[in-house]
Amino acid sequence: MSVDLAFDEQELLPAVAQDAESGDVLMLAYVSEEAVARSRETGYAHYYSRSREELWKKGGSSGHTQEIEEIRVDCDGDAILYLVEQAGGACHTGYDTCFHRTLDGDIVGEQVFDPEEIYE
């Protein structure tokens, strides 16, 4: 890596996934150094689950993968941006993006799959 990344005390960084074509923000997750390395090696987004305390590939269960077109780093090196080609929905709730609701609770995104059919 030619840019120094400023991982936090848990050795994680926030990672935003953005659709490379539309510019839509798809999700926010966290990455470890290993997740970044795996993403670069495979060309597919990998993250670190804070609740399960493990590395995971986006779409590993659902098939809704994120093929990485570019990885960008913010000015402080403490967050990264995955520019991706999203296959299927990005959100585990079935929506195209995890940002599918307003603060008032209005649904503004599109549900593109039924999570009960995917995550049995």
From Swiss-Prot:
Q: Which cofactor does it need?
A: Mg(2+); Zn(2+)
Q: Where does Zn(2+) bind?
A: C75, C91, C98
**Major subcellular site:** cytoplasm
Q: What Pfam families does its record include?
A: PRA-CH (PF01502)
Identify the EC number(s). Answer: 3.5.4.19
Q: Which SUPFAM superfamilies match?
A: HisI-like
Top-level taxon: Archaea
Q: Name one GO molecular function term.
A: magnesium ion binding
- Coiled-coil stretches are none
Catalyzed reactions: 1-(5-phospho-beta-D-ribosyl)-5'-AMP + H2O = 1-(5-phospho-beta-D-ribosyl)-5-[(5-phospho-beta-D-ribosylamino)methylideneamino]imidazole-4-carboxamide
Q: Per the UniProt record, which residue ranges are transmembrane? A: none
Which of UniProt's keywords are assigned here? Amino-acid biosynthesis, Cytoplasm, Histidine biosynthesis, Hydrolase, Magnesium, Metal-binding, Zinc
The compartments listed are: Cytoplasm
Name the GO cellular-component terms: cytoplasm
Q: Which free-text remark accompanies the cofactor?
A: Binds 1 Mg(2+) ion per subunit. Binds 1 zinc ion per subunit.
Record GO biological process:
L-histidine biosynthetic process
The task this protein performs is described as: Catalyzes the hydrolysis of the adenine ring of phosphoribosyl-AMP.
Please describe the quaternary structure of this protein. Answer: Homodimer.
Protein name, per record? Phosphoribosyl-AMP cyclohydrolase
Which gene codes for it? hisI
